Amino acid sequence: EACAICLIWSTVNNVHEKQLGEWLGDALPDLAITLSHQLNPILREYRRASSTAIDASVKPAMQKHLLDLQDDFRKKGFEGQLLVSSSNGGCMDVEAASKRPIHTVRSGPAMAPVAGKACAELERCKGPIVVVDTGGTTFDVSLIVDGDISITTETWIGERFTGHMLGLPAVDARSVGSGGGSIAWIDDGGLLRIGPQSARARPGPACYGTGGDLPTVTDAAVVLGYIDPNYFLAGEMKLDRGAALKAVSGLANQLKVSVSEAAFSILTVSNESMINA
């Protein structure tokens, strides 16, 4: 589906890298190809190779999604410029994003500090600002000092050192797998873990009643009564506390504790992960 090409000295002489790209393009015209010297022309080859591989891996899906989105807007009469948020806190043209989709990989977490800065300015808050963004899969936290959003080149997809280095400038937002849909599980050593696997929106937490049967952070909150199952989303969505109890009970049996104790442990570990972010 895709190919990443990274030769060690292509930033000095890109002839061989370009030639490989041309050969592959001729032989496989539908193949998504990323050349490292075009994407991230730096001497540090590990960072360059990592960013090239990430870009190539997301390119087939992102190109189709972004270009289809643009076509849909055009068909509906939209004549403006369609922009996509980027990992460095800015925006880029949708066609540019489809050619270099890696720049959108951390665009979600990057927008929280941008919004946080804007809100702080409206409130005339001048002190350091901690911005928190939590969803179904991750808990993201960033810091704004003196009105400046911190940018880093040390961003990892997944765990630091064991995940994949982005290798490009991005907003410095720390992410941990402690979202509402993060799944609680027991590792080989018998310790309780949260995430990074998530139930996501579908099938979702067990209490959603949409097919999920694994214990999540949201299920634990429902079991303990922290979330009112009858007034979720202002009453627009009813949650199934029985399903949440059943999901958490499986974990409780493994830990040999009560369901309430297991639910409390899930939230405790989740909260500790957020604090350590």
Predicted regions and their residues:
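N-terminally biased helix-coil "hinge/interface" segments that flank
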Residues: 1-277
